[in-house]
């Protein structure tokens, strides 16, 4: 670049221009070499048969071109495939210059049907440069057999085809060319067919099968031929095809009867349907050409046609009308048998019928028209059928009358020899769907002849019946926790209609169950009526519901009806028992306490449990699963009460651990358990509450426990409020009458014994021990001046009282003279002293010396005893207004308080308490008359009763002395005595004694 741009180098220019003429001559020399003839450019031709194995030699290109490969050197030759055939069928050996087969050559695949198959190559040589064209011709060999397009050919040729008819056959194909292609065809020997070959084009021929003799299906119905194609190769190859020629029948034979004339005899009285003769004809053709149909030919007169008929398929000729010898003694019947070919062919015969004379022509009923079915809502006079009658006799015997059964809803209307059958009454398809109406035809001859004709009249349906369920209601019982989609029940409704009027579809009427549509619970298959559960049912949420199923038909208009399916959810044992009391947590057991002096059978506590299930699944059974002392405690199976089996002694431990299992009666059974710690102490008051047991986190309370706490708190508040209100009212009333009672404290009205004695009417005799101090917890006994046998008492109790027994000595009327034989009732020491060990200071003993000694007293029906009330009373007595307080003459050791209502003598003797009765010196006891107390005999009821105390009015009513049943001997609770006292108050007794009695009664009623 630098030299090209420097001009001063002019001295070197002559040396640069010297080689230029030689460079210009080189292209000219190369062009000259290419144009010169000789080994530089040549044309080579080779041929090789197809299907040669790879490596087969085609020719030596180097030798043909006169090239010496040793002088040229390696890589001086190269071959190119013109047209780039793929794959490369030929290759050149660069070391030897030989052209050989590289891959198998299939001429048919490479060149198909072309006459010549050539492969064009180009050989390039270097030093010197030479280009040679090479043509390799692929020679065909006979490697393919001729082949027909189909292996079998089916030809159908009618037997009526004339000889010379041609039938084209497809030619065979051979992929080879030239002499190796198909050259000739051969046909198997046949007397009916031959092969005709016509050239179409080079190496192609047209094949035709030529009929050279007529066909007869009756002789040969099928012909089998073999067509063979042969090529010109060596050895020759061939291919075959099967040709089946089926000969089609033509109606070329006419039917033929066994006889041309048949002769028979027939009685005149032959009824319709009598077989006259059975004809037989035959036809050698096949198919429809051989099927025969019998009929009366046109030569048969109408008279014969009315009397005789022939069965088209069997050829039986039968009588259809009445034969009359007087009219015709013989009949000629012409019968033809016709085949069913395209061009029917017929055969004929004649039947001669000779009538044997008898005189008995019966009328004939002919059904002209029948309009069946008849709709069930057809109106009267609707035409059902049109009938006609015929009698071959003459004169009076020809007159025919028709009749029906009177019970049918049809009647006949006649005009001449024709009758119409019409509707005369209501039709009901559901009751009768088809009527077989028998029409009786009677002629006027002597004797009368009759004939019957039965008409089958069908009644068509209309939609006049709604679907009806098989049951008014369906009861479905399904266990809870069912799987969704379970089949509940299949309801079924029937419709007496038919077809679409009887097709019933089912659906559920819309309604809500617990705020949700019914389809949220139940689904129904509209076609089958099967009810399925959509969801799982829970017995504890709802136990039963009902769905209304509507069944509707598909009539026009549609009719429907409804049915009810009651679904009852059956409880399963899916809830374990829940222990309400006592409750325990995982960290601590329930705590209970009991005194060490508790006897056998002592109630320690009671396990309360509940089960959300029902029925036997909710039956609970209590078991003692574990305890530290197996012999000390037992659990009641059904109540859950835990009691001691023996007395707790000093040898027992201080605490006992128990585990109580509550099990239900389900299958399988579920259970719950609670742990209980029982502490044994000397006194219950010393036991401190377990704060861990009673103080719980609010989260541990269940919803049920919360409801129980609210309910108990509400009840306790109402009860406390009621007690306060009653106490205020009572204090107000006592204050009004001079008696103080405040804040739940019951006091005694301060009166001296002398004052009380002055106001008494000597009906009550009461004695109190010396130095007895009246306590605020008292029993009040009142007596009335006017009603000396009516008393009331009041018991004011404290929470510390442990006695639950009250002894009351009843009074009775005097039944006879002499001293009373009444005695005190005997109670055991436990009843008198109570289980808490207190003395029997709560016992008041009433005495009446006028007690009947003859018979025991029956309980008054007015008495009602409440077991929930206890009369734990201390030894204090308040005798108000009608009582007498006085000391007995016996001194302190024998000063037993006595209450008497019948004996006015204060000097009567006193009886000490019975030995072993558990009554100490500070107790009240009965006062008896002189003498020892009388013991009750076996089976007798004592006149004295021990009755638990109750804050209610106790009335002792005295009946007259001659009364058989002394009702005053018993205690009465209720309002009868109060009603009597109110009536007496209305009578106007205004004395202070009656006022005080009325006030006392009102006070007791408030209690």
From Swiss-Prot:
PANTHER family xref list: CADHERIN-87A, PROTOCADHERIN ALPHA-C2
InterPro entries for the chain: Cadherin-like_dom (IPR002126), Cadherin-like_sf (IPR015919), Cadherin_C (IPR032455), Cadherin_CBD (IPR031904), Cadherin_CS (IPR020894), Cadherin_N (IPR013164), Protocadherin/Cadherin-CA (IPR050174)
Region (4 X 4 AA repeats of P-X-X-P): 856-951
Transmembrane stretches, start-end: 709-729
Keywords: Calcium, Cell adhesion, Cell membrane, Glycoprotein, Membrane, Repeat, Signal, Transmembrane, Transmembrane helix
Keyword DNA damage applies: no
Gene3D superfamilies assigned: Cadherins
PXXP repeats: 856-859, 889-892, 930-933, 948-951
Stretches in topological domain Cytoplasmic: 730-1007
Any one of the GO CC terms: plasma membrane
Gene: PCDHAC2
Record-given protein name: Protocadherin alpha-C2
Coiled-coil region list: none
Keyword ATP-binding: no
Residues that carry a glycan: 280, 436, 586, 657
Molecular function terms from GO: calcium ion binding
Ranges of compositional bias, category Basic and acidic residues: 966-980
Membrane topology: Single-pass type I membrane protein
Segments of this protein annotated with the region Disordered: 885-1007
SUPFAM superfamilies: Cadherin-like (SSF49313)
UniProt topological domain (Extracellular) ranges: 43-708
Function: Potential calcium-dependent cell-adhesion protein. May be involved in the establishment and maintenance of specific neuronal connections in the brain.
Example GO biological process: nervous system development
């Amino acid at each position: 670049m630098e030299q090209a741009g420097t001009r001063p180098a002019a001295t070197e220019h002559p040396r640069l221009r010297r080689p230029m003429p030689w460079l210009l001559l080189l292209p000219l020399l190369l062009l000259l070499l290419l144009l010169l003839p000789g080994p530089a450019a040549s044309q080579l031709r080779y041929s090789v048969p197809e299907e040669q194995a790879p490596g087969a030699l085609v020719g030596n290109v180097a030798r043909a071109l006169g090239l010496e490969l040793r002088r040229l050197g390696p890589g001086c030759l190269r071959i190119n495939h013109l047209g780039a055939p793929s794959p490369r069928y030929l290759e050149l050996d660069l070391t030897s210059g030989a052209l050989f087969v590289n891959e198998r050559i299939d001429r048919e695949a490479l060149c198909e049907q072309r006459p010549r198959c050539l492969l064009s190559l180009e050989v390039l040589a270097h030093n010197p440069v030479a280009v040679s064209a090479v043509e390799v011709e692929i020679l065909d060999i006979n490697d393919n057999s001729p082949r027909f397009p189909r292996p079998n050919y089916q030809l159908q040729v009618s037997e009526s085809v004339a000889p010379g008819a041609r039938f084209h056959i497809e030619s065979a194909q051979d992929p080879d060319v030239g002499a190796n292609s198909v050259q000739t065809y051969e046909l198997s020997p046949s007397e009916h067919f031959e092969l005709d070959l016509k050239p179409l084009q080079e190496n192609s021929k047209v094949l035709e099968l030529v009929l050279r003799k007529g066909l007869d299906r009756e002789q040969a119905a099928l012909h089998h031929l073999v067509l063979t194609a042969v090529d010109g190769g060596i050895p020759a190859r061939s291919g075959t095809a099967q040709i089946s020629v089926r000969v089609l029948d033509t109606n070329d034979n006419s039917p033929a009867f066994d006889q041309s004339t048949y002769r028979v005899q027939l009685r005149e009285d032959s009824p319709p349907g009598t077989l006259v003769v059975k004809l037989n004809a035959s036809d050698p053709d096949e198919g429809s050409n051989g099927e025969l149909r019998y009929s009366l030919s046109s030569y048969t007169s109408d008279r014969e046609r009315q009397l005789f008929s022939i069965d088209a398929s069997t050829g039986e000729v039968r009588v259809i009308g009445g034969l009359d010898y007087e009219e015709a003694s013989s009949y000629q019947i012409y019968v033809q048998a016709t085949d069913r070919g395209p061009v029917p062919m017929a055969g004929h015969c004649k039947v001669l019928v000779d009538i044997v004379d008898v005189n008995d022509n019966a009328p004939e009923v002919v059904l002209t028209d029948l309009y069946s079915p008849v709709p069930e809502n057809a109106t009267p006079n609707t035409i059902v059928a049109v009938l006609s009658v015929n009698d071959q006799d003459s004169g009076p015997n020809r007159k025919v009358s028709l009749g029906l059964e009177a019970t049918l809803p049809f009647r006949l209307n006649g005009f001449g020899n024709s009758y119409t059958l019409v509707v005369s009454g209501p039709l009901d398809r559901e009751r009768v769907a088809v009527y077989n109406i028998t029409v009786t035809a009677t002629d006027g001859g002597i004797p009368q002849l009759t004939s019957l004709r039965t008409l089958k009249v069908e009644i068509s349906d209309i939609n006049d019946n709604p679907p009806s369920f098989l049951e008014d209601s369906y009861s479905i019982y399904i266990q809870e926790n069912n799987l969704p989609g379970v089949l509940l029940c299949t309801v079924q409704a029937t419709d007496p209609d038919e077809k679409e009027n009887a097709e019933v579809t089912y659906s559920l009427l819309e309604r809500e169950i617990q705020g949700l549509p019914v389809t949220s619970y139940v689904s129904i298959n509209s076609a089958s009526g099967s009810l399925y559960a959509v969801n799982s049912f829970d017995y504890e949420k709802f136990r039963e519901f009902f769905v209304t199923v509507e069944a509707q038909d598909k009539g026009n208009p549609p009719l429907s009806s409804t049915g009810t399916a009651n679904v009852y959810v059956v409880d399963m044992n899916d809830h374990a028992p829940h222990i309400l009391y006592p409750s325990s947590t995982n960290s601590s057991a329930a705590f209970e306490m009991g005194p060490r002096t508790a006897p056998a059978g002592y109630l320690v506590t009671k396990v309360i449990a509940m089960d959300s299930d029902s029925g036997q699944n909710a039956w609970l059974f209590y078991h003692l699963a574990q305890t530290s002392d197996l012999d000390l405690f037992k659990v009641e199976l059904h109540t859950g009460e835990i009691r001691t089996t023996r007395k707790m002694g000093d040898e027992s431990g201080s605490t006992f651990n128990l585990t109580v299992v509550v099990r239900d009666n389900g299958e399988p059974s579920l259970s719950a358990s609670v742990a209980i710690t029982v502490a044994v102490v000397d006194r219950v008051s010393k036991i401190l509450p377990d704060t861990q047991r009673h103080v719980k986190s609010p989260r541990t309370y269940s919803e049920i426990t919360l409801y129980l706490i609210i309910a108990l708190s509400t009840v306790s508040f109402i009860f406390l409020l009621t007690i306060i209100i009653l106490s205020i009212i009572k204090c107000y009333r006592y204050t009004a009458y001079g008696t103080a009672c405040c804040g739940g404290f019951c006091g005694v009205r301060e009166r001296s014994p002398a004052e009380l004695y002055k106001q008494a009417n000597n009906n009550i005799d009461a004695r109190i021990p010396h130095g007895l101090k009246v306590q605020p917890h008292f029993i009040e006994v009142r007596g009335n001046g006017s009603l000396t046998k009516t008393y009331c008492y009041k018991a004011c109790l404290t929470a510390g009282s442990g006695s639950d027994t009250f002894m009351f000595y009843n009074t009775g009327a005097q039944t006879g003279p002499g001293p009373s034989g009444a005695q005190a009732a005997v109670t055991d020491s436990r009843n008198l002293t109570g289980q808490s060990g207190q003395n029997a200071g709560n016992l008041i003993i009433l005495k009446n010396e006028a007690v009947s000694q003859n018979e025991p007293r029956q309980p008054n029906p007015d008495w009602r005893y409440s077991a929930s009330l206890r009369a734990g009373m201390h030894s204090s007595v308040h005798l108000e207004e009608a009582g007498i307080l006085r000391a007995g003459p016996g001194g302190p050791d024998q000063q037993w308080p006595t209450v008497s209502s019948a004996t006015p003598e204060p000097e009567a003797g006193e009886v000490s308490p019975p030995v072993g009765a558990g009554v100490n010196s500070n107790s009240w006891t009965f006062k008896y008359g002189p003498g020892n107390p009388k013991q009750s005999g076996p089976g007798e009821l004592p006149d004295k009763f021990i009755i638990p105390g109750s804050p209610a009015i106790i009335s002792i009513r005295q009946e007259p002395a001659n009364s058989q049943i002394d009702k005053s001997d018993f205690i009465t609770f209720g309002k009868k005595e109060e009603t009597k006292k109110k009536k007496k108050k209305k009578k106007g007794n205004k004395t202070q004694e009656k006022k005080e009695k009325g006030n006392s009664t009102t006070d007791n009623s408030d209690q």
